Amino acid sequence: MKLEPMIYTNDIANSIKFYRDTLGFEIDEYYPNDETPTWIAVRIGNDRLGIGRTFPDIKYKLHPRGVDGSGVQFYIKVTDVDEFYEKFRNKVEIIDDIENKSWGDREFTFKDPDGYLVSFYSKIK
């Protein structure tokens, strides 16, 4: 069994640009194709994050989205968080600057184009 979170966007092209071009993640899958995708899977290490638009044939209602993707935060564990901070600090809008946290992580946080929170962290040695 494997958990694969799914987030929704109104602008899939902007999400592709952000996750692939800005963050450097691999797009593992495009649906229905890479020219006009309505859904993508972003590879982050051994995990995937689905990003897509809703489809008319989905029979259940998605909960209304809060302000800027509120309620969702992705934590990405890396070996050297300072290296990732230097790589991304001029490419994304940092909302919580890099620092050691009381719970034993060194981390920084930014928002993706839809307002979902993304944090990179390393354990404090």
Q: Which residues make up each language-model segment?
A:
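Conserved active-site tyrosine of GNAT-family acetyltransferases
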Residues: 15-20, 88, 112-115
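Generic secretory/membrane-interface signal
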Residues: 13, 20, 99-101
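Vicinal oxygen chelate
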Residues: 1-6, 26-76, 85-111, 122-125
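Short, conserved beta-strand/loop elements in beta-sheet-dominated catalytic cores
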Residues: 116-120
